[in-house]
């Protein structure tokens, strides 16, 4: 167990609490989607317990939406609407190999089953009425419509945001100076909060390195904090040209800003920092970013590594508030094409990107530090 000061521990716990309050509306969004897709009815028709694949078949949603359904059900199980049980003979059909989680109705979700199918009076009409604002609000970004949408062969994997608005969040930021400023200010505030704790409690992760490149580092909040703490460290911030154009002109002497694209190339350095970046991208996109990072750093023996600051879902499964916050934030990210990953999901993309070893340190509350080695 890593020991940190009581002040830092309280700040990290307060961060989780605020994040939970901020994104708790995603539980209502998940419930609205469950009602729209008639998930409780689907499980009821399977005898009260069903795997994801079985639910998918019952509700008539395409198999490519299975990961999205998993994320909806993860929120609804953590919040207690459904529960996960051991596979039974009924659920271990030819459709399942016994490794899929099996979702069971609880007393709460049994009240979502339609009255025609259940002896218990259904509350679905009442909840449909109460939750209707979430269907029409940008807060949900048309998640139900996304589940029902047939994938376009010309644009596979389109996220709910793009389906609703016809563009990506990043393109909106590029075109709209006000939204770009709002986003950059939000990321800078997060960096100021997190780096204060990181450099106070865990500064050793930056010891013994000569150069660092902060990939998609925005206006440089994290990098400038690191550079101030380590004046001999040569630091580079890489981001898109329209982002670095808004960087402060009076930056610290050992920090430079470079306009570029992480999907094309990354400036060379001993260490690459990816703070809260990879969760915005699909597995394939993360693998491409990580391969470019690998080309930018030396071997492990020569001090090369990647420092990732991101969520590892289930990093402390004993903390129910933390876990709930991680999964409801993951559902929020799903709307823009992002994803929060558990350790096995992280490991998969690390190996596919050609890395040999990694170390996860769940020491930043909601997020963890991951050191990744070539």
Swiss-Prot record:
It holds the Pfam family Methyltransf_2. It is an enzyme of class 2 (transferase). One of its GO terms (biological process) is biosynthetic process. Its EC number is 2.1.1.n7. The keyword Phosphoprotein does not apply. The active site is at 279 (proton acceptor). InterPro entries: COMT-like, O_MeTrfase_dom, Plant_O-MeTrfase_dimerisation, SAM-dependent_MTases_sf, WH-like_DNA-bd_sf, WH_DNA-bd_sf. Coiled coil: none annotated. PROSITE patterns: SAM_OMT_II. One of its GO terms (molecular function) is 5-n-alk(en)ylresorcinol O-methyltransferase activity. S-adenosyl-L-methionine binds at residues 239, 261-262, 275. It catalyses: (8Z,11Z)-5-(pentadeca-8,11,14-trien-1-yl)resorcinol + S-adenosyl-L-methionine = (8Z,11Z)-5-(pentadeca- 8,11,14-trien-1-yl)resorcinol-3-methyl ether + S-adenosyl-L-homocysteine + H(+). The keyword Nucleus does not apply. Keywords: Methyltransferase, S-adenosyl-L-methionine, Transferase. Expressed predominantly in root hairs. Belongs to the class I-like SAM-binding methyltransferase superfamily. Cation-independent O-methyltransferase family. COMT subfamily. Homodimer. O-methyltransferase involved in the biosynthetic pathway of the phytotoxin sorgoleone, a potent broad-spectrum inhibitor active against many agronomically important monocot and dicot weed species. Substrate specificity for alkylresorcinols. Strong preference for a five carbons alkyl side chain. PANTHER family: O-METHYLTRANSFERASE (PTHR11746). This is 5-pentadecatrienyl resorcinol O-methyltransferase.
